[in-house]
């Protein structure tokens, strides 16, 4: 497994409230924040244009995806952008202000053998001061992770919420001829195959701490539930009752797993311990109950049931036992995903032979359609900060993994290669 970058030093982190007093926070689609994203300069030794360009380009792509920033043309940048020195006293704030910059990203790097040291700084141009800084140390191969991590900090500095760019996405890819589990960065880089079951693997989900992934595999002929430790690669079979053991989801506190099993003859929602031991049966109904998704507090479950004829989204209160139908429209609603901030539930709906993605409040109000156009858009999952959704789509003719903002804008395909990709899951922060 790819080694995580070590964060050595956190420098002068200002509070979110201080930053909000300097830069008005705008939602995607509203007036954006003007950012000068400069290429990092060598702290010592020979300039390495490839490293500088990669750090800059990864950061630029992350900031563009957020929808919060307007990036100034680097061709207009000053000599100040190429000067060494990262203290506020070395920044020509007057000249950056004349260019229209509201915030400024500068930094430096140093490569010694395979060891890479990167310093980032984020400045408030309007008030002429440092907002935040980070120093990262790792290997040359960690350069993209370092840029993602600082992009997370840029979002935190201007919104109060850390970005999701250094998290990861699990998904299913059949590039080998079999549906196997893969892992990639949020921009599609560093794709890594996690299983070699030579069978069908489906429905991955990350543990809340991001250290494990659970998934269903037909490796032994039955759809059994497996768990894999990402740091060691160790795999264990958790649930293997005859029939279905599918669509498993970790409870937000990481102590239990909800899934669908059909050992009783009818697909029902069950609650298991993380060791696979059965805790209790959650549903007992003639209809099919599948695709559970936890509320952030872990006290409610959204799920799909055809108990009223057609597949619809329902919400179950685990404390009181009451169940209420969430979706009022459409004849086929599926794959609910509760946002980490608790404000919205994403799901797919089949209309006129095509699946599209919608969101709705947990009380069933304010339904919004997010996707349009040709092709199916399925299996939505939220980013850990609730700003984005990842999903699978065949809109380009071949199933791939896509990311979009929570309002449906900024659609970007992130998967590559010749396989058909589906069933994405988004990890928490790392």
From Swiss-Prot:
Keyword Amino-acid biosynthesis listed: no
Places the protein is found: Periplasm
Keywords: Cell cycle, Cell division, Periplasm, Signal
UniProt cross-references to InterPro entries, sorted A to Z: 6-blade_b-propeller_TolB-like, PD40, Tol-Pal_TolB, TolB_N
Keyword Ribonucleoprotein attributed: no
GO cellular component: periplasmic space
Signal peptide (from-to): 1-21
Main subcellular location of this protein, as a coarse class: periplasm
GO biological process, one term: cell division
Ranges in coiled-coil conformation: none
HAMAP family (alphabetical): TolB
Known function: Part of the Tol-Pal system, which plays a role in outer membrane invagination during cell division and is important for maintaining outer membrane integrity.
Family, as annotated: Belongs to the TolB family.
Subunit structure: The Tol-Pal system is composed of five core proteins: the inner membrane proteins TolA, TolQ and TolR, the periplasmic protein TolB and the outer membrane protein Pal. They form a network linking the inner and outer membranes and the peptidoglycan layer.
Protein name per the record: Tol-Pal system protein TolB
Organism: Syntrophotalea carbinolica (strain DSM 2380 / NBRC 103641 / GraBd1) (Pelobacter carbinolicus)
Gene assigned in the entry: tolB
